[in-house]
């Protein structure tokens, strides 16, 4: 019964929702590419939690887009970038909120383009920090040959895509390890996924791996890097800044809808009625135009992601 219940819940989440509440309807009816419907998408491993984060902002946006014919909103989750790419190409999703790395993957496949930067907790850009134990003898990325590094998970921008790309740019070859006890071949950098920032800092502190990576925001958070650990660590490199998150739209979205969506999202930060919806939307504080610096950072990140997919994964 539990398994059946989970399958039913997953099905209802895929079916999406109207602007007021989820509806029970056949799949094709719920995701039809109606001109009056704005569909917000997200690549998700936790659809229920993400639905609750997305819905308030969608509820805020839709009534403000009546002038371009939008009267209804729906949410559609995808399990991975490939499925989301399919949704975008087929017009089943109009707007996607994603990490910078995932956004560049969708853009590379030609199904979406960046709309706005997303500022969360007052931060629109961040960077990746590489760190090691002070007594490790590691002072730079060049010292990582024959050593090991802990990433977070294979979807993380700050704790996988950016640092892995940085290592490749330094001429280092990455080799996945079976466990922290495994050692890389001579001349390569062995890597593992630790699943959380706290695990990363713990593994480095306990010498299970030689180097860890995370965003500068997580590096400064004592819940991710306990103060008892920090005194034993040294930062060996910090990357350039890159966007924290992006809003994407499908490549063939009606220009009038795209323009109005951009306008509504940018103006939301100054509207008291949007405050709670923005907070629920991954603690968003405002949406920002994509300037030349952000474009360059996204292009560099996108090239790195494609190189990782070709040479590492």
Feature roles, as predicted:
Residues 97-110, 163-169, 202-231:
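A ligand-binding cleft/hinge motif common to bilobed small-molecule-binding domains
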Residues 35-44, 111-112, 116-132, 181-187, ...:
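Periplasmic-binding protein-like
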Residues 78-96, 109, 190-217:
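Short helices/loops that flank or line small-molecule/ion binding pockets
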Residues 35-64, 126-201, 275-276:
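Bilobed "Venus flytrap"/periplasmic-binding protein-like clamshell domains
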Residues 151-166, 263-313:
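Ligand-binding clefts/hinges and TM-proximal coupling segments of bilobed small-molecule sensing domains
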Residues 1-5:
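N-terminal secretory signal peptides that target proteins for export/translocation
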Residues 31-104:
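Extracytoplasmic small-molecule ligand-binding "clamshell" domains
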Residues 10-25:
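Bacterial N-terminal signal peptides
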């Amino acid at each position: 019964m539990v398994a059946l219940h989970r399958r039913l819940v997953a099905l209802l989440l895929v079916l999406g929702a109207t602007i007021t509440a989820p509806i029970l309807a056949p799949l094709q009816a719920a995701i039809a590419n109606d001109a009056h419907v704005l569909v917000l998408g997200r690549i998700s491993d936790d659809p229920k939690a993400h639905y609750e984060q997305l819905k308030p902002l969608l509820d805020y946006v839709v009534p403000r887009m009546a002038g371009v014919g939008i009267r209804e909103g729906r949410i559609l989750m995808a399990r991975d970038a490939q499925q989301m790419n399919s949704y975008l190409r087929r017009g089943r999703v109009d707007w996607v909120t994603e990490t910078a790395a995932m956004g560049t993957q969708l853009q590379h496949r030609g199904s979406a383009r960046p709309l706005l930067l997303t500022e969360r907790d007052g931060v629109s850009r961040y960077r990746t920090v590489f760190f090691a134990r002070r007594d490790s003898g590691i002072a730079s990325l060049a010292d990582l040959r024959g050593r090991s590094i802990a990433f977070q998970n294979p979807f993380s921008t700050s704790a996988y895509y950016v640092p892995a790309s940085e290592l490749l740019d330094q001429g280092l070859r990455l080799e996945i390890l079976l466990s922290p006890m495994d050692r890389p071949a001579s001349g390569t950098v062995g890597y593992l996924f630790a699943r959380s920032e706290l695990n990363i800092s713990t593994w480095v502190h306990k010498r299970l791996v030689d180097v860890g990576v995370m965003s500068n925001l997580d590096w400064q958070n004592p819940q991710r890097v306990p103060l008892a650990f920090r005194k034993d660590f040294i930062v060996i490199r910090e990357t350039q800044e890159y966007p924290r998150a992006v809003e994407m739209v499908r490549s063939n979205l009606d220009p009038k809808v795209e323009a109005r969506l951009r306008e509504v999202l940018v103006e939301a930060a100054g509207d008291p009625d949007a405050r709670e919806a923005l907070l629920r939307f991954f603690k968003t504080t405002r949406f920002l135009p994509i300037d030349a610096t952000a474009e360059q950072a996204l292009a560099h990140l996108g090239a790195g992601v494609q190189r990782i997919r070709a040479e590492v994964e």
